[in-house]
């Protein structure tokens, strides 16, 4: 699945794919696959990103427009 908000919040935070990959202890290439929707992102990564960005997982998934 492709969730453009994952990319959008990263760019809004002025972070690179490498920055976020390092946070998740994965390669930039692996993170890129998740961001483009070519691989399913594990829930543990999704929750880590939500916590890091201070938004809800539902927001990242596009299920709500409420940030928190």
Segments from the language model and where they lie:
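A detector for short, charged/polar N-terminal pre-domain segments
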Residues: 1-4, 39
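Short basic helix-loop element that most often maps to the first helix and adjoining turn
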Residues: 4-23, 48
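Conserved hydrophobic/aromatic packing and binding residues within compact polymer-binding modules
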Residues: 6, 20-21, 31-34, 60
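Conserved functional loop/turn residues at catalytic and ligand-binding sites
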Residues: 14, 19, 35-38, 64
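DNA major-groove recognition helix of helix-turn-helix/homeodomain DNA-binding modules
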Residues: 25, 44-59
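Recognition helix of helix-turn-helix/homeodomain-like DNA-binding domains
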Residues: 25-40
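Short, basic-rich loop-to-helix N-cap that marks the start of a DNA-contacting helix
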Residues: 38-48, 67
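Short, charged recognition helix plus adjacent turn
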Residues: 51, 61-68
